Amino acid sequence: MASGMGVDENCVARFNELKIRKTVKWIVFKIENTKIVVEKDGKGNADEFRGALPANDCRFAVYNCGNKIQFVLWCPDNAPVKPRMTYASSKDALLKKLDGATAVALEAHEMGDLAPLA
């Protein structure tokens, strides 16, 4: 199911900085109205990255693992149903714009699902 969600230009620009310049290690994206935008980014480790994800809401993220850039669909089990559906149906729109991120998203529902990023 396609959502028709737009992707803000800054998402691609920040991703390229992560991929090429390595100025940040991770980026968290959120849906704002009908567009995917950058919410925050950081240079810290996996623990800092996990701390940047909301406990009760969905997000997209990318994390530079060194040998690959992992795309993450963060949908905690306690997030409302509508955002979970919106994020799930919108991930391909963002993935298509982020050239170099893993094609298969790591779908995480709890912090333990993010253990492979350590």
Curated annotation (Swiss-Prot):
Q: Record's GO cellular component, any one?
A: actin cytoskeleton
Q: Name one Pfam family in it.
A: Cofilin_ADF
The Swiss-Prot or TrEMBL record annotates one GO molecular function as: protein sequestering activity
What InterPro entries does this protein map onto? Answer: ADF-H, ADF-H/Gelsolin-like_dom_sf, ADF/Cofilin
Q: What biological-process GO terms show up in the record? A: actin filament depolymerization; negative regulation of actin filament polymerization
Signal sequence region: none
- The segment(s) forming the ADF-H domain are 4-118
Chief location of this protein?
A: cytoplasm
Localization, UniProt = Cytoplasm
Functional pH dependence: pH-independent.
Keyword line: Actin-binding, Cytoplasm
Q: Which family does it belong to?
A: Belongs to the actin-binding proteins ADF family.
Q: How does it assemble?
A: Interacts with ACT1 (G-actin); the interaction results in inhibition of actin polymerization. Interacts with DPA; the interaction enhances ADF activity in disassembly of filamentous actin and inhibition of actin polymerization.
Give a short account of what the protein does.
Answer: Inhibits actin polymerization. Promotes actin depolymerization. Strongly sequesters actin monomers (G-actin). Weakly severs actin filaments (F-actin).
Under which name does UniProt file this protein?
Actin depolymerizing factor ADF
**Taxonomic classification, please?**
Eukaryota, Sar, Alveolata, Apicomplexa, Conoidasida
Which gene is transcribed and translated to give this protein?
ADF
